[in-house]
Amino acid sequence: MNGAARSNLGKRLLAEEAGITKLDADALSGGRGGQLVMHPGNDVGAACASGSFRHDGMVVVPASSNTLAKIAHGISDNLVQRAAQVTLKERRPLVIAHRESPIGLTEIEAMRKVTEAGAVVAPLSPGLYLQPESVNDLIDFMAGRLLDLLGVDHQLPIRWDEHLAEQREAKRERHSTPR
């Protein structure tokens, strides 16, 4: 992770994926994080930048327009960009969570290029239809969507059908309560 470890969404993904709830040296060195390893952002020679490194997929979150453009054009100035290039080359799942708005034509073209190369572009736009009550609800939604896109099971409340079922149950309870 480059920058994402400091963001709420990055922290939520670490919690859901690896059970890491506190970012400290122990957690990030593998103590509680299992196989989690940190590399400096400029270490383009790290194992995860090699096609022989086995993994189930990669999420770039949050992805700036600069990072998106560099991935789209095969430019690898840092480890995140290099690992993303290798992920595409090896035909593994790559999800790019673009963070910027408004989206201009150059970003749209970069999104087209990475999509054609096999990536999924998932703008960081949370589902307001679930009627979030807090910023954490919005973060949970986006973390759950990103995990879904990688095929990772989770328990985050993001399903529309589950939300509808909860609404119906609440409505039944309101109507069955004597006034």
Regions found by a protein language model. Name each.
Residues 1-94, 102-179:
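A cross-family phosphate/adenosyl-ligand binding-site feature
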